[in-house]
Amino acid sequence: MPTKSIKIMVEGGNVKPGPPLAPTLSQLGLNVGEVVKKLNEATSSFKGMSVPVTIEVDSNTKKYEIKVGIPTTTALLLKEAGASEPSGDPAHKKIGNLSLEQVIKIVIMKKPGLTTKSLKAAVKSMLGTAKSIGVTVENKDPKELVKEVEEGKYDDLLAKYENEWNEVKE
């Protein structure tokens, strides 16, 4: 069965039946409206964020499968912080604040794409990203939280999520 893969970035829950997607789907003999509807359903939980999507199409049967990826770390942090874009000056202009628990939940969601093996290391990496886009965590500079995480100040909170972290397949 010859398959064709279409890899695209879409806005979660807001895919439109226009170019460049529609012509590609039409060439493969797919119903554009139906595919767009299914894309919007599949990405609705990521409303307003750019989401990587792969559509696997069987050229013979015209059956297709939609595989939704995970939005970028920046997009997830921005959504959680209620901001639309990163700070142009993250050292001086803060765009939002998150709890460490919110950061941990994003880390768990992103685990399949991360190279870090421990929850603690992944959280420290995510704190670095938060700092680079102007998001504070626990009303502090994320760099300060990295030190506190290393010192063990949040070990109890991390332990609470350790099982969930371990259950996620890489």
From Swiss-Prot:
The answer on whether this UniProt entry bears the keyword Iron reads: no
Q: Which PROSITE patterns match?
A: RIBOSOMAL_L11
Cysteines joined through disulfide linkages: none
Which Gene3D superfamilies does the UniProt record give?
Answer: Ribosomal protein L11, C-terminal domain, Ribosomal protein L11/L12, N-terminal domain
Keywords tagged on the record: Ribonucleoprotein, Ribosomal protein, RNA-binding, rRNA-binding
Q: Which InterPro entries match?
A: Ribosomal_uL11 (IPR000911), Ribosomal_uL11_C (IPR020783), Ribosomal_uL11_C_sf (IPR036769), Ribosomal_uL11_CS (IPR020785), Ribosomal_uL11_N (IPR020784), Ribosomal_uL11_N_sf (IPR036796)
Q: Which GO terms describe its biological process?
A: translation
Subunit field text? Part of the ribosomal stalk of the 50S ribosomal subunit. Interacts with L10 and the large rRNA to form the base of the stalk. L10 forms an elongated spine to which L12 dimers bind in a sequential fashion forming a multimeric L10(L12)X complex.
Q: Which family does it belong to?
A: Belongs to the universal ribosomal protein uL11 family.
NCBIfam families in UniProt: PRK01143.1
PANTHER family found in the cross-reference section = 60S RIBOSOMAL PROTEIN L12, LARGE RIBOSOMAL SUBUNIT PROTEIN UL11M
Q: Could you identify this protein by its name?
A: Large ribosomal subunit protein uL11
